[in-house]
């Protein structure tokens, strides 16, 4: 009976060690993904600013009218 308890404790310790390793790996991956999200967000912000600037410039441009042959 004591041997069964020791084996059970050993299996539980192995399981906990495996879970700790998995949690650490997932945490590292999450941190890397967060960096990618932040970089993507920064790019989107820059593109949005550029788009709005170009849109504003286009509104200031001469309006397109029908050519005289229409």
UniProtKB/Swiss-Prot annotation:
Disulfide bonds: none annotated. Belongs to the SlyX family. Coiled coil: none annotated. Pfam families: SlyX (PF04102). This is Protein SlyX homolog. Transmembrane segments: none annotated. HAMAP family: SlyX.
């Amino acid at each position: 009976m004591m041997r069964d308890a020791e084996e059970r404790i050993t299996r539980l310790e192995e399981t906990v060690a495996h879970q700790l390793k998995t949690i650490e790996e997932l945490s590292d991956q999450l941190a890397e993904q967060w960096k990618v999200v932040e970089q993507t967000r920064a790019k989107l912000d820059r593109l949005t600013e550029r788009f709005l600037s170009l849109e504003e410039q286009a509104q200031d441009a001469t309006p397109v009218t029908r050519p005289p042959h229409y």
